[in-house]
Amino acid sequence: MKRQCKGSDVSKAVLVVAVLFFTVLRSNGQQIKPADSGYVPVDGNKVYYEVYGDGKPIILLHGAFFTIGMNWGQLIPELSKQRKVIAIELQGHGHTPYSDRKLTFPSLAADVEKVMDYLKIDSADVAGFSMGGSVAYQLTIQSPKRVRKLVIISSTYKSGGWRPEVTNAFKGFKPEFFTNFPFKAAYDAVAPDKTKWTKYLEQMIAFAGTPFDLGDANIAKITSPVLIISGDNDGLDKIELAKTYQLLGGGLSADLGPMPKSHLAIVPSQGHVSLMMQTKTLAGYLEDFLK
């Protein structure tokens, strides 16, 4: 007999995720200050960005409930040694104000484009983690000429790309799970309007629990080289991940033909959040792929 998934089981799963976020918050604090930062007007609101280093541009998109520092704090110093790094905080996250505008992947991708326009960046490499990876997929779909190379870290373009227990955990999120963890302190430290905390959580929880699918056909049309990085136990359905790689032209026998331009890396002994903490591993993959 299959054991029924009780509400307390989901609560425990969410609590574990929150503890992992706490680990990231403590370990991945920002190490260097940006050379430039500011806001870009978007649809009656504004989006916050930070710029580091010089060279070919790479845009970094964080995961749900993260900030730039939490998500990219350890990688930015490495990437900015040779690249111009543009890190963006998506709607409601970090310094970017809460907005009543409905969250959609097309609207978030459009926000990224507006930051690119503002900074006079015609095209760039784009890297996204978790929700940020889904936004990066959408950006590549709707504006392919703006993405030179795409890096997807522990992310998917559809709800079905996650294992069932992960999607169930998304549905079980509640604002109170976040209040007693460092999320609140991190939010209060930088949010323009601290009174929007609960509304922000409610909006993000609803978005995280809403099924989505950017379309197999759209993924198959992507012409930019794509690097997919996944932890072997990061919650992604690895059968679906293999199908995604095949849609991108991978999963072939390179002994019988040319090596595909898109790559897949499975990092052993890593979960969803712990994968982002493997700075040397990720920096090595990105350096090789983005040459």
Predicted regions mapped to residue ranges:
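Alpha/beta-hydrolase fold catalytic core
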Residues: 2-58, 82, 291
